[in-house]
Amino acid sequence: MPTLLFRSPSDPATAWTTALRRHDAGLDVRVWPATGAVEDIEYALIWASPDGFLHDLPALRVVFSLGAGVDHLMGSEVPEGVELVRMVDPALTEGMIEYVAYQVLRRHRHMADYERQQTGAEWRIHSQTRPGERRVGLLGLGELGSACARTLSGLGFDVAGWARSSHEIPGVTAVSGSDGLDWLLGRSDIVICLLPLTEATRGILNGQLFQRMSPGSTLINAARGQHLVEDDLLIALGEGRLGHAVLDAFQEEPLPPGHAFWRHPHITVTPHIASLTNPDTGAEAVARGIHADQAGEPIPHRVDRGRGY
């Protein structure tokens, strides 16, 4: 009987253990700190390893991340020789599609302007632009980025995407390299960051990048707070280089009450809720991974530690 250890400071243990047992009745699920005999534990489903406890599990084979990102597990937290698997959950993808499409449509149709006008009883109609005339650029064309790109293209937007390697996505202009990035930034009315957090992408949303963006454009960061140089964003907004920013992730979370972002008229703050892992569909993905490993087959969505995703 395979044994899995669940540990998370915020995800509901009962919901996850119930779902895991439903998708694999033969799985022995344990919840930290009730580990039982640690030499039995082959699998771990966690958000982080703050105290290095994974190194105390001698039979550990695979660590499943509770989130789509694995940047928090890329140091020495996961022992050498142990597979690291990122979460690819249909509900997680659906949630990101909803968030990104909503924020793009909100900017596209001037909804924030109309809400402000209502507070002052101001009847003013803004011009409407057809979706095909609104250029949207995505940074990152992984599982989430590609899904969002396809959805936005299906809504009629002029969509381009940039990634480290070349991609082919119907209805989307996919580019790579520094020239491709320059082209995407300069032509996009809305730029969406869905990049994985690696040493190469840490701080990528900075003053130099903002200078290359179309004047007055909108930035949506639904990836990691560490992608963004916060002071550079405030400068870019103050100078009018950017028109608005929608931020779902931050350097420090929860965002401190006194932080400038909360009350900035050109920043929309959401509390890292763009997409949340669903226990039922997430547990199904984990069960599939365990079944594959037990059968001696490759586990889907394994992380390349050299690339960081």
Predicted regions and their residues:
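C-terminal helix-to-coil terminal segments
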Residues: 83-87, 91-96, 113-114, 253-309
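Glycine-rich NAD(P)-binding loop of Rossmann-like domains
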Residues: 114-147, 174
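Phosphate-coordination loops involved in phosphoryl transfer and adenosine-cofactor binding
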Residues: 1, 81, 132-135, 216
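Phosphate/diphosphate ligand-binding glycine-rich loop within oxidoreductases
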Residues: 42-115
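Rossmann-like adenosine-cofactor binding region
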Residues: 165-260
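Gly/Ala-rich phosphate-binding loop of Rossmann-like dinucleotide-binding domains
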Residues: 149, 153, 237-238
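Short acidic low-complexity segments
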Residues: 29-40, 51-54, 171-187
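N-terminal glycine-/charge-rich "phosphate-binding" loop or analogous flexible N-terminal tail
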Residues: 1-43
